[in-house]
């Protein structure tokens, strides 16, 4: 199979390697269809920021089940799936409390081990979930980044009937805007320094947008105060 391999000092190459085999009964092999490039990948590519080299990055990806281990009976070849890249230890105090993202001994697909910039990958069954049959497979690669905004809404006890302000209309912000609208926000406001991104924010459901590079700090404070304080 082909994979994108990163060496040190920003060197990127396409390499041929053996298709990985399933070694444990709780594993599945995924034929990757779509894999996103995260902002966190950039220092790993250009600033020697990965844990080791050479490495295949990619932690936002979707694809189709290609093979399953003997202990997997709820997924079958051809099923569309997305990947959850976090690999907690499940035994440390934080994991036992359910705070898997705080695991002291976590592993991570596409960062601490080879990831989704390849044609195939073998992962644990618990690290993939089936996608709706009517979802375009490319959309599945957005599942991991969309959870960033959803996590914030979860910490805020939801956003239904609330005034939601998204600061930064990059990929994560634009996904959060769509989530806020879908979850019943009273209003959704986007703030950025890029007019192009703010236009995208409007197209994705933001009810009002502000370019903070064109406003003074007192003006921005006044806008935020009006948005946050009840009338």
Where are these regions (language model features)?
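Adenosine-nucleotide cofactor-binding segment
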Residues: 166-169, 181-231
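N-terminal Rossmann-fold NAD(P) dinucleotide-binding loop
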Residues: 173-174
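Glycine-rich beta-strand-centered segment in the early N-terminal region that forms part
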Residues: 20-35, 48-93, 132-134
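NAD(P)H dinucleotide-binding glycine-rich loop of Rossmann-like/cofactor-binding domains
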Residues: 89-167, 215
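Cytochrome P450 core scaffold surrounding the K-helix E-X-X-R motif
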Residues: 40-45
